[in-house]
Design a protein with these regions (language model features):
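Secondary-structure edge/capping motif, primarily at the C-terminal ends of alpha-helices
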Residues: 97, 119-126, 154, 180-187
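Short hydrophobic/aromatic patch on the recognition helix
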Residues: 54, 61-72
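Basic, helix-initiating cap at the start of DNA-binding domains
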Residues: 1-47, 51-60, 76-80
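Short, hydrophobic secondary-structure boundary micro-motifs
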Residues: 120-123, 135, 192-193, 215
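Short helix-capping/turn signature of helix-turn-helix
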Residues: 72, 124-129
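C-terminal effector-binding regulatory domain of bacterial HTH transcription factors
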Residues: 210-219
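Amphipathic alpha-helical packing segments from all-alpha helical-bundle domains
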Residues: 130-156, 163-181, 194-211
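Alpha-helical structural segments
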Residues: 31-42, 46, 60, 70, ...
């Protein structure tokens, strides 16, 4: 299977000289900051957070290190801003009204593909880094919480057994995160529908075994 490719590039453009009006200057500064963060995310995800210095970032971005320090105080700040931004996007998505598993998965894959390096930093790199793990825990716990609520209202037996319900919710969170990571790195975009069908059928099978007293199944 061909691996999916990212359109991100580590090279960043240089702003033209000049002193525009304050509002335009602020907008340009924000655009520049966003551009730098996207490029930094690609380098950090590829090389590893702890193995990448500010010098290495600047070199691979093709800019002087002073440019990075003009926008960010440290590499740690860059990493945390990247993680918080993708986590905020994830939280915004998950706060929407539930419209079914299929719809949710479409939105999740779209988000992860559009921000592949950032999502991998959140879902993989922060999970293995003690200092950054709280970001991963927020991602993981959001899936656990939503799954727990769905199971609680769908199954009388699981409603009364919080331990088993939490076990199921934890399993679903781990399953989905691992599946999404693997798919955005290896699955072709034009086969996303196959991923949605596979994920939906997999969860249906699990829920059927976990909730024999319920007629609810993911759609």
């Amino acid at each position: 299977m061909a691996r999916s490719t990212s359109r991100q590039t580590t090279k960043v453009t240089h702003l033209q000289k000049g002193r525009p009006p304050l509002e335009e200057a602020n907008a340009r500064r924000q655009e520049r900051s966003d551009e730098l963060l996207r490029a930094c995310a690609l380098v950090l995800e590829r090389n590893g957070v702890r193995r990448t210095s500010m010098d290495a970032l600047a070199e691979q971005l093709g800019i002087p290190k002073s440019v990075l320090y003009r926008y960010f105080g440290s590499k740690d700040e860059i990493v945390r801003v990247i993680l918080q931004r993708i986590l905020d996007l994830w939280s915004d998505l998950q706060s929407k009204r539930w419209r079914g598993l299929s719809h949710n998965l479409h939105e999740v894959i779209a988000l992860a593909r559009a921000n592949q390096s950032e999502f991998l930093l959140l879902a993989r790199h922060s999970a293995a880094d003690p200092e950054l793990r709280p970001f991963f825990e927020s991602l993981h716990s959001s899936i656990v919480s939503k799954t727990d609520k769905l199971l609680e209202i769908s199954s009388p037996s699981l409603k009364s057994d919080t331990v088993i319900r939490q076990l199921c919710s934890q399993a679903v969170a781990g399953f989905l995160i691992d599946a999404i990571i693997w798919w955005i790195e290896n699955g072709e975009n034009n086969r996303d529908d196959e991923f949605f069908q596979w994920a939906r059928q997999s969860l249906k099978t699990l829920y059927r075994e976990w909730m024999p007293d319920s007629s609810w199944r993911p759609t």
